[in-house]
């Protein structure tokens, strides 16, 4: 699958790994133009996770990055499990798709032969977008099913978001689930850095999300003391009050409109694009897209950009909301141009392989449950300076939990009967 770096210093120390290898991991990450950092908030264990995989799926120069924001009693375990399993399953799905359909344009040789200069070949473009959408959607569903059957992690009221990206040469394919976010830094006509939000924060109050939830007998409303924070609730209980409309896990809500289907996006990179920031809502709740881009752009040492961004977010939490608990933060910064230091240290590196032959500047493939958003339209965002809340308000009563377990057991018995 490639070289992966997923675990922070604290997690490695928990597992008895000597942190004397810090410099090695730092160099390995930065050789791929990646800066990543996470910091525990004031709510207990750090439930955020992140990962980066170089030479992903066996393709030289291809990279996978992801951040995951866990919630609920076992949110930490869910986020770590998805972090470890998702890249493996996605890599396997890519390999299987290439083996079954060599013309799918997901393998290196086909991609290099693809004509990606024509904007008029819309049918081929749609086919490619559809191929990537299907791969991501199937992989996310497999990971969610893996969680459902996991005997060591109770995911009834625990789950995680995920925002992931695969970079293949000049092409970005992004898959988003929940309210973590991907933001690109590009340059305007005067060479000034500007932010472009590439994902939609999938909150319960988005019209398409709310419609799906209500059609499944779920409920969407905000509590009196949090009028600006819409939440998702069970039909007959004011629980769990989930602050997002899509997530891995949270199986008590999966029959009531919560889905694990990601929205899949595509962007063709240009010479004006500088870097991509993936981050959990601990960042976006206190810093705007513009502020994040400014902080990362101003980092004199790009390899430390993620750490500086997290530290700024923590200071902003304390200054703006002194009575609120600082949230966990996780950031991955993917720099899209080689730095002078990295190009000097690796002069013999091969040119990254050509990639998915998508055309156009920015396109989105919906993974279900939403309407198509045209380029340049406004996107729903996390509430800046307001969403200082837990992702889950309260756990449902035992009756709802037992009901979910009965449905889950029934599904497993049906599957076994069909196999027999």
Curated annotation (Swiss-Prot):
Residues that bind Mn(2+) 2: 69, 281, 327
Residue numbers spanned by region Disordered: 96-119
Residues covered by the PPM-type phosphatase domain: 33-336
Keyword S-adenosyl-L-methionine: no
Catalytic reaction(s) noted: O-phospho-L-seryl-[protein] + H2O = L-seryl-[protein] + phosphate; O-phospho-L-threonyl-[protein] + H2O = L-threonyl-[protein] + phosphate
EC number: 3.1.3.16
InterPro entries in alphabetical order: PP2C, PPM-type-like_dom_sf, PPM-type_phosphatase-like_dom
Start-end of Polar residues biased regions: 96-105
Record's cofactor remark: Binds 2 magnesium or manganese ions per subunit.
PANTHER family, alphabetized: PROTEIN PHOSPHATASE
Name of the protein in question: Probable protein phosphatase 2C 73
Organism: Oryza sativa subsp. japonica
